[in-house]
């Protein structure tokens, strides 16, 4: 059993090996990694998703600490996408994370 199978074996028991492989092959974009988006991105990483693109222009500030996963004393002033990307890599080292620090609008699509 390799590290990925050990790390995400619970997902395979829930969705089957085929389901886990679909998650591993998936690429998901999370637009906005604040209060809700950070939780969504972390849940995707913990589910074995193979690639995540994170999009957010904002930086972590002290007032985020009470509700945002990536908001810690040491991440204040850092780009939210960079702080979240680091957290995701610690959870799921095989996940390919692209961090885009920019504002999302119809021109970005």
Language model regions located:
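Glycine-rich phosphate-binding loop and adjoining beta1-alpha1-beta2 segment
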Residues: 49-92
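Rossmann-fold cofactor-recognition segment
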Residues: 71, 98-99
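Conserved SAM/SAH-binding loop
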Residues: 100-108
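Residues at or immediately flanking beta-strands
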Residues: 27, 96-98
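Glycine-rich adenosine-cofactor-binding loop
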Residues: 24-45, 51-56
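Electropositive phosphate-/nucleotide-binding environments in soluble metabolic enzymes
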Residues: 5, 13, 17, 34, ...
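N-terminal charged helix/coil linker that caps or initiates catalytic domains
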Residues: 1-29
